[in-house]
A protein has these predicted regions:
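Catalytic Walker B motif of ABC-type/P-loop ATPase nucleotide-binding domains
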Residues: 163-166
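The feature captures the beta-strand-to-loop junction immediately N-terminal to the Walker
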Residues: 46-48
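Helix-to-loop junction immediately C-terminal to a conserved catalytic motif
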Residues: 61
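Conserved ABC ATPase "signature" region
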Residues: 105, 109, 116-134, 186
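Conserved signature/switch motifs of ABC ATPase nucleotide-binding domains
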Residues: 137-140, 158
Length: 288
């Protein structure tokens, strides 16, 4: 029997928002959301825009609160922010006034690790993501792909049990995205963290994952979960195989009826900048 790292049972999420006429209305984002994530697996979640994929990840990260249901990590109810989880956002979430090395070390600093030790560890992960020579650079001096490498290194540096990734490669060009997908798999194969990965890309989900979960339109729930029985390590050429095409077709068949039927998203409170969420995750005081 597989060991379940994360268990969600009948999770629900509602919030107040403004409709197009500026009137308050209650938005039901998640309802009857059930999911079990196995320890050490790479699980991707697919779904139409606005179905609640990122909302569930934010609840799991402790950045949002469910309004019902049960959510457990390691067999214990999740209470707020879990320090054993790392989060990688689509928007990089780097602290703009910190160097690359200091950005990678920020989680260790929050945990009270001494300066010498945290910088030594940060250099190890800087090397792991292939950014030697950029330690003293600042985020604005890096390309999008390099910034996301720093974000991944930062999340891994304090050795979390679980890595939550919210469309981390969505804003990158196709070549950089495929390169970072392969890099992520290389790192995952070495460390075997439990990864929950949000994406809109069928190809990305299939290439990366052990299993793929497909969500319904809002209110979101898990419609189907299926295994990706493709050998590892996964090389780029895998995308051209008949087996890959088969899984892509299966994912699309599960998703097709949900796409296009998703309700329009009401206007909600403006989101925080991604680096402000990093501050919340660590209790890091940066004047926000």
């Amino acid at each position: 029997m597989p060991v379940h790292k994360i268990v969600a049972r009948d999770v629900r999420m509602e919030y107040q928002a403004l409709d197009e006429a500026g009137r308050q209305e209650r938005v039901n984002v998640l309802e009857g959301f059930d999911l079990q994530v196995r320890e050490g697996e790479f699980l991707s979640i697919l779904g139409p825009s606005g179905c609640g994929k990122s909302t569930f990840l934010n609840i799991l990260a402790g950045l949002a609160h469910k309004t019902g249901g049960d959510l457990e990590v390691d067999g214990k109810p999740l209470q707020g922010i879990n320090r054993n989880q790392g989060v990688v956002f689509q928007g990089y979430a780097l602290l703009p006034w910190r160097s690359v090395l200091d950005n990678i070390a920020v989680g260790l600093e929050i945990r009270g690790v001494g300066k010498a030790q945290r910088l030594e560890t940060a250099r190890e992960y800087l090397d792991l993501v292939g950014l030697n020579g950029f330690a003293s650079r600042y985020p604005h001096e890096l390309s999008g792909g390099m910034r996301q490498r720093v974000a991944i290194a930062r999340s891994l540096a304090y050795d979390p049990d679980v890595l939550l990734m919210d469309e981390p490669f969505a804003a990158l060009d196709a070549q950089t995205r495929e390169t970072l997908q392969s890099e992520l798999l290389r790192i995952w194969d070495k460390h075997k963290k439990t990864i929950v990965f949000i994406t809109h890309s069928l190809d990305e989900a299939i290439f990366l994952s052990d299993r793929v979960a497909v969500m319904t339109q809002r209110p979101g729930r898990i419609k189907e979960i299926f295994d990706i029985d493709l050998a590892r390590p996964r090389l780029p050429e895998l995308r051209n195989t008949q087996a890959f095409v088969h899984y892509r077709q299966r994912a699309w068949e599960a998703l097709r009826d949900e796409v296009g039927g998703a309700a329009s998203q009401p206007v909600a409170e403006a989101p925080r900048q991604a680096w402000q969420n990093v501050a919340r995750l660590g209790g890091y005081r940066i004047g926000v």
